[in-house]
């Protein structure tokens, strides 16, 4: 597995990130985390490390907090393992009726950011978070308040680095203005089917057809400022790599057929081709792979060894677009 330095840090991390959302029983309500969940998480961590993956992505809301709880219990089963891994989590989403009568919302207040980070530390059974991301933009955010929350957590040794998720170029620039240190990551939906990060450049000045709103300058901001681009849902829930072709749109079917053909030709699993398409982009994209199957990491680790020509990369893009390049 290829390793890279996370920008603005001394953290050597795997190019592929292990997404932990499905741990702790998933989104089924009323689950109490127990020994079975801890054992599953322990096997998940071991399988990821065996494949060379040492970077783990969480959020305080995943599985209603149970994903972090299960991971923490699993981590505790192997004493001394914490220094070998990099833990990242996210905060800022608040569910409906939290507290009773409150709406579903986002919250970047100082109090909530600090409380969320401390809750994650308790559930993960660790003294520090390597990276904390703001999950989704809060329309009521105040840059000064966020900066104060970050400074408090950093001074206490509870969080080492900070980043964002689902933010555009203007939002990143606004937040960075108030911070004393650079943001290290922005996690966005990027994949062969969700290729707005590419389409924004291709379709600029070409009329409105297919133009992705919101991507203007986001990719370039991250590249210019050393913000790691992390891709959530890089496999589109496995649509291109395992779904029946008959269930797909014409563009999806064309992309899936081409992708699966390339996988057979290169002797790698289809997942590796889908991830390698992202890895080929010069922005240094880091896919976040969501799975509870430790064996799947080995299959996807092959992505870092796949070499795409420019022609192969564009062939997949054109198939996924469902129309010729402008």
Where are these regions (language model features)?
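Beta/alpha (TIM)-barrel catalytic core signal, keyed to glycine-rich beta->alpha loops juxtaposed to Asp/Glu
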Residues: 137-326
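Short catalytic-loop micro-motif centered on adjacent basic/acidic residues
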Residues: 55-62, 133-134, 160-163
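Short, well-ordered coil/turn segments that N-cap beta-strands
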Residues: 11-16, 52-54, 81-85, 126-130, ...
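Short, acidic/polar
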Residues: 34-48, 108-124, 170-173
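A short, structured active-site edge motif that brings together acidic residues
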Residues: 83-96, 187-192
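N-terminal binding-site loop/beta-alpha segment at the start of enzyme catalytic domains
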Residues: 1-86, 155
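Active-site groove signature of glycoside hydrolases
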Residues: 121-140
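Acidic/histidine-rich helix-loop elements
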Residues: 22-35, 97-107, 199-200
């Amino acid at each position: 597995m290829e390793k890279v330095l996370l920008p603005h840090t001394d953290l050597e991390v795997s190019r592929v990130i292990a997404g932990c959302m499905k741990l702790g029983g998933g989104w089924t309500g009323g689950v109490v985390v127990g020994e079975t969940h801890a054992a599953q998480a322990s096997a998940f961590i071991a399988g990821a490390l065996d494949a060379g993956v040492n970077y783990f992505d969480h959020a305080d809301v995943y599985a209603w907090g149970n994903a972090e709880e299960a991971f923490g219990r699993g981590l505790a089963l192997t004493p001394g393992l914490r220094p070998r891994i990099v833990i990242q989590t996210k905060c800022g989403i608040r569910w409906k009726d939290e507290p009773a009568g409150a709406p579903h919302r986002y919250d970047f207040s100082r109090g909530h950011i600090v409380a969320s980070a401390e809750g994650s530390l308790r559930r993960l059974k660790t003294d520090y978070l390597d990276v904390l991301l703001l999950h989704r933009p809060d329309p009521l955010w105040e840059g000064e308040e966020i900066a104060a929350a970050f400074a408090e957590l950093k001074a206490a040794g509870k969080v080492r680095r900070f980043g964002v998720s689902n933010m555009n170029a203007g939002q990143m620039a606004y937040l960075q203005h108030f911070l004393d240190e650079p943001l290290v990551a922005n996690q966005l939906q990027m994949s062969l089917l969700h290729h707005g990060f590419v389409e924004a450049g291709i379709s600029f000045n070409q009329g409105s057809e297919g133009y992705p709103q919101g991507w203007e300058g986001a990719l370039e901001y991250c590249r210019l400022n050393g913000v790691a681009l992390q891709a959530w849902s890089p496999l589109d829930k496995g649509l291109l790599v395992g779904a029946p072709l008959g269930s797909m749109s014409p563009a999806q079917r064309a992309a899936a057929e081409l992708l699966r053909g390339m996988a057979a030709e290169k002797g790698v699993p289809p997942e590796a081709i889908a991830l390698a398409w992202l890895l080929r982009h010069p922005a240094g994209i880091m896919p976040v792979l969501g799975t509870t199957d430790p064996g799947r990491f080995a299959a996807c680790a092959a992505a870092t060894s796949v070499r795409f020509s420019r022609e192969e990369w564009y062939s997949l893009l054109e198939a996924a677009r469902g129309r010729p390049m402008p």
